[in-house]
Regions:
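Bacterial N-terminal signal peptides
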Residues: 2-13
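Extracellular/periplasmic metallocenter environments
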Residues: 15-21, 78-117
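Edge beta-strand plus adjacent loop/short-helix module at the start
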Residues: 21-41
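Short loop/turn segments at connectors of secondary-structure elements within structured domains
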Residues: 26, 40, 61-63, 108-110
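Beta-strand cores of secreted/periplasmic/IMS beta-sandwich domains, seen most often
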Residues: 28-31, 42-61, 80-91, 95, ...
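Short structured motifs
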Residues: 38-40, 69-72, 82-84
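Short edge-strand/loop segments of extracellular domains
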Residues: 72-73, 116
């Protein structure tokens, strides 16, 4: 019994603190502005398989953000509020996004592209 306890203590002590080898840096944050009929930037490059936080600022009114090909990710972007969403592109490719809240004539041109590499 004592031998088992000693062996367990040696194993856990040599392993170090839980997660010490797996410390990861905070996710990348991409800042995006949304205003009538455009996102800036409207082309965003990210790494496939790595979570990225998109942080939106609405400059004029409520806008939407949706990426149909990434499981229908969706966010309402409100002026004066923190608007964040984590994006994970599982594989390399091009993913289109658009505003899904009508914001006037020209709304259909409020689009962009996520390029996962």
């Amino acid at each position: 019994m004592v031998l088992i306890i000693v062996a367990f203590c040696l194993l856990t002590a040599s392993a170090g603190p839980a997660g010490a080898a797996e410390q990861s840096s905070p996710p990348e944050v991409v800042k995006i502005t949304a205003k009538r009929f455009e996102y800036s930037p409207n082309e965003i490059r990210i790494k496939a398989g790595v979570p990225v936080v998109f942080e939106f600022t609405a400059l004029d009114r409520i806008h939407g953000f949706t990426v149909p090909d990434l499981g229908g990710i969706r966010l309402t972007i409100e002026p004066g509020k923190e608007n964040r969403i984590t994006i994970l592109a599982p594989k390399a490719g091009t993913y289109q996004f658009h505003c899904d809240i009508f914001c006037g004539d020209g709304h259909e041109g409020m689009t962009g592209t996520i390029i996962a590499e």
